[in-house]
């Protein structure tokens, strides 16, 4: 929903410490707009068959150059994972693993957090983990900003810490989605 995306974009901006624009809308809204209801199906279809194209579009929308800032081999490996993975466990793990790999490895430089968050949402919609894209995991991550940063820094040695935090974020995000639906 549009409300879910706006909440996510605002929380992402706060998580990254990004300044709000003069109109109060964070620059991250452009990246999140790739999942707006009018274009969501098209973005997710493209993500399923050409994920690097969608990652590039997210980065460009966030003000980046549209290519990984480092370790393009990891980006290629993630693309293969997205296009070849299947099964219930894969459906649950993909959004979390994708987010962790992009954010912890800073694949898109300063835009890595927003690219990771938007890509994780696209993955969750694609796999059916969050088929309508209503969950707002960003709010939880913003509330647990210090733990998130610590888990990102320790990802190489203890990836389970970040995975657990991200699963908790998705659980809390689903609860927030229920609240949005009830208020509508």
Regions found by a protein language model. Give the residues of each.
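FIC/Doc superfamily catalytic core
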Residues: 1-184
